[in-house]
Every structure is written in C-alpha cells, then in structure tokens.
Regions:
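Structural detector for short beta-strands of small beta-barrel domains
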Residues: 1-13, 46-47
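Well-ordered beta-strand positions in beta-sheet-rich domains
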Residues: 2-4, 26, 62
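Short solvent-exposed loop/turn micro-motifs enriched in small/polar/acidic residues
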Residues: 10-12, 28, 61
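OB-fold/S1-family single-stranded nucleic acid-binding modules
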Residues: 52-71
Length: 71
C-alpha cells in the first residue's frame, strides 16, 4: 500500500514516530529510516500493514516501511 501524510512524534516517554494521512488516519511506523524521524515533514510511504505486531503506543495500525519519498 502507498500512503501520503505528515510525520508526527506520538506518545509518552521516548514516543514513537507516526504517519498521519490527509484524511486523519494514523499509522505507527516500523523500520523507519532516520530521515523519516523529523516531525512535520510531508512524505509518501510504501509499505505493508503488520497485523502480527503489537506495540505499547497503540496509536494505529503498524506500517512497515518498505520505501519512501519526501514531498
């Protein structure tokens, strides 16, 4: 799947990196490159939803990043 949105830091403590799409859907990023760990950047991410992965953040579906493009 390919989704477009804005990177945000979510949660308490160390937090987690998330992609918030233009329609408001939030995905927790898995295996995000350091370049993606910048709050407020607009990106297009290609990846797959990992239904077999649970996290402490529980902010949305886990999106395993396969590739990305800064917009």
């Amino acid at each position: 799947m390919t989704v477009t949105g804005t990177i945000e830091k979510k949660g308490f403590g160390f937090g987690t990196w998330a992609l918030v799409t233009d329609d408001g859907t939030t995905y927790e990023l898995k295996d995000a490159a350091d370049e993606l760990k910048q709050e407020g950047i607009k990106v297009e991410i290609k990846g797959k939803i990992r239904e077999d992965v649970m996290t402490m953040a529980m902010i949305g579906a886990v999106l395993e990043v396969e590739s990305y493009k800064l917009l």
